[in-house]
Amino acid sequence: MIAAIGAVASNGMLGLNNWLPWDIPEELAYFERTVAGAALVVGRLTYESMDVVPVDTFVVTGQKDYAVRSGCQRVASVEAALRQALATGKPVFVIGGASIYAAAWPYCDRFFLTRIGKPFDGDTRFPDSIPLDRWTVVEDREERYLERHSGEAVVCRFLQYAQPVFKPLPAV
């Protein structure tokens, strides 16, 4: 299984200063539970924003001398990262950022996307190139949580999309 997971505000924003534009602990806990024990594919900037990085994290960067933490691997392309992540025998999750989602979605059979029911300021948008309208919604549930920056209640819609036909990884 190759899946992607992320969250997006109602105005399409998914990041601000290499982190989330919102502070919703329950949504972050959902992310952590969902990816627990998986191999992760992540872009360099998202990787640098992470306090805790599990083993079997594959960091996509063009910087050949980029040093990663113990248990992680630097890779030059999304395809190489996905191949190496699959070789671990674990489920694989693509966790961002935007350019990594845009490059990886054709290979994903699932996309776990939380839609945050409020606009947020941000500097990174969810990629318009991902045609989720052509995917099948296989799970859809809503919860209301407190967003800690604003103190307001926010609806989080937890969606799981299935892509009926996904692209096989090219042979090495």
Question: How would you label these PLM feature ranges?
Answer:
Residues 1-172:
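Enzymes that bind and transform nitrogen-containing heteroaromatic metabolites
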